From Swiss-Prot:
Keyword Secreted: yes
Protein name: Polymeric immunoglobulin receptor
Role played: Mediates selective transcytosis of polymeric IgA and IgM across mucosal epithelial cells. Binds polymeric IgA and IgM at the basolateral surface of epithelial cells. The complex is then transported across the cell to be secreted at the apical surface. During this process, a cleavage occurs that separates the extracellular (known as the secretory component) from the transmembrane segment. Through its N-linked glycans ensures anchoring of secretory IgA (sIgA) molecules to mucus lining the epithelial surface to neutralize extracellular pathogens.
Description of post-translational modifications: N-glycosylated. N-glycosylation is required for anchoring IgA molecules to mucus, but is not necessary for Ig binding.
Keyword entries, A-Z: Cell membrane, Immunoglobulin domain, Membrane, Repeat, Secreted, Transmembrane
Membrane disposition: Single-pass type I membrane protein
Protein localization: Cell membrane; Secreted
Amino acid sequence: YGETAAVYVAVESR
């Protein structure tokens, strides 16, 4: 948990 969360937030933040 950490990298996946960062990537998920980055994609959802688009």
